[in-house]
From Swiss-Prot:
UniProt keyword annotation of RNA-binding present: yes
Matches recorded under Gene3D superfamilies: Cucumovirus coat protein, subunit A (2.60.120.530)
GO cellular component: ribonucleoprotein complex; T=3 icosahedral viral capsid; viral nucleocapsid
Ranges of biased composition (kind: Low complexity): 1-10
Listed Basic residues bias regions: 11-21
Location of N-acetylmethionine modifications: 1
Sorted UniProt keywords: Acetylation, Capsid protein, Ribonucleoprotein, RNA-binding, T=3 icosahedral capsid protein, Viral nucleoprotein, Virion
The record's note on its domains: The N-terminal arginine-rich stretch does not seem to be the major RNA-binding region that allows formation of an infectious ribonucleoprotein complex.
Pfam families found in the cross-reference section: Cucumo_coat
GO molecular function, one term: RNA binding
Protein name: Capsid protein
Region Disordered, annotated ranges: 1-29
Superkingdom of this protein's organism: Viruses
Length: 218
């Protein structure tokens, strides 16, 4: 083999090696993209069942109805003895209640367990007559009549349960912001005493949009 043939053969070998080295990353990239897509789908599936401890939006990631927004209030139940009850009427801020004829579509309760939570609680929201004093007997009867959905939230050895939301639809009732004082959040501590540092309830009231102030507070 003369020198020119040897040089040509060497060039061809280098070309083949270069072609191989270029194709290898391409194949790896394709496999990585497939794996990333699979992990992304898996993460979305798992995320759907996770508790929403940080909750920047209404109903997790669900959007409000067109033309609606929401107002959040936070309730921290006091100590509730085993087998006893707690009730608190919904009191929205004055800046919202002045638009008392704006319609309300949904109420959502989100249970936020604190690090010491190790109990079982039942949570619901009910329309309560103004004459009711939210006594233990009255709240017990409302839990028993089955007239409203109830969220049973409990501690699990593997961590807190995924389902931490209760959604109450008021669309058919044509309820408005002025009606909210007639509704109350009710809690039943089933198995043991619920301490004050175990639980926080976030109540989101979805209502028609209200005008926002264009003047800074004094």
């Amino acid at each position: 083999m003369d020198k020119s043939e040897s040089t040509s053969a060497g060039r061809n070998r280098r070309r083949r090696l270069r072609r191989g080295s270029r194709s290898a990353p391409s194949s790896a990239d394709a496999n990585f993209r497939v794996l990333s897509q699979q992990l992304s789908r898996l993460n979305k599936t798992l995320s759907a069942g996770r508790p929403t401890i940080n909750h920047p939006t209404f109903v997790g990631s669900e959007r409000c109805k067109p033309g609606y927004t929401f107002t959040s209030i936070t309730l921290k139940p006091p100590k509730i003895d085993r087998g006893s009850y707690y009730g608190k009427r919904l009191l929205l801020p004055d800046s919202v209640t002045e638009y008392d004829k704006k319609l309300v579509s949904r109420i959502q309760i989100r249970v936020n367990p604190l690090p010491k939570f190790d109990s079982t609680v039942w949570v619901t929201v009910r329309k309560v007559p103004a004459s009711s004093d939210l006594s233990v007997a009255a709240i017990s009867a409302m839990f028993a009549d089955g007239a409203s959905p109830v969220l049973v939230y409990q501690y699990a050895a593997s961590g807190v349960q995924a389902n931490n939301k209760l959604l109450y639809d008021l669309s058919a009732m044509r309820a408005d912001i002025g009606d909210m004082r007639k509704y109350a959040v009710l809690v039943y501590s089933k198995d043991d005493t619920l301490e004050t540092d175990e639980l926080v309830l976030h109540v989101d009231v979805e209502h028609q949009r209200i005008p926002t102030s264009g003047v800074l507070p004094v």
